[in-house]
Amino acid sequence: MIPGEIITKSTEVEINNHHPETVIEVENTGDRPIQVGSHFHFYEANAALDFEREMAYGKHLDIPAGAAVRFEPGDKKEVQLVEYAGKRKIFGFRGMVNGPIDESRVYRPTDENDAYAGVFGDNGAENVNKKGGKRS
């Protein structure tokens, strides 16, 4: 062995193999590329990404640490998400959680929410979060 040498296994390393997986379709409805990193709380990703936000609550991309997924304008692709482990507390990002991951804290659109949003013209294709998530 050489000092500082790293000896790795000859087999592939499986990541997140003990976490439940969720696959969702995501579309970039914006006019600029959007990149989401491996540990970013996907529920809080850029509002120009159109997807079922409820499905992403408490989850991050199932990719190696330090990697990212890039969405070009108009891109539509499926991504695989896995649940956060550990203490399951999320702070920062867009400030939509700032505490424990708890399903009761997920924003779920209702007819009343949609009627209220309609007053301000937020009821058509321009509503990038029409499938769920927090309206900003």
Swiss-Prot record:
Its EC number is 3.5.1.5. One of its GO terms (molecular function) is urease activity. Pathway: Nitrogen metabolism; urea degradation; CO(2) and NH(3) from urea (urease route): step 1/1. GO terms for cellular component: urease complex. Pfam families: Urease_beta. Keywords: Cytoplasm, Hydrolase. The keyword Iron does not apply. It is found in: Cytoplasm. One of its GO terms (biological process) is urea catabolic process. It catalyses: urea + 2 H2O + H(+) = hydrogencarbonate + 2 NH4(+). Its main location: cytoplasm. Heterotrimer of UreA (gamma), UreB (beta) and UreC (alpha) subunits. Three heterotrimers associate to form the active enzyme. Belongs to the urease beta subunit family. This is Urease subunit beta.
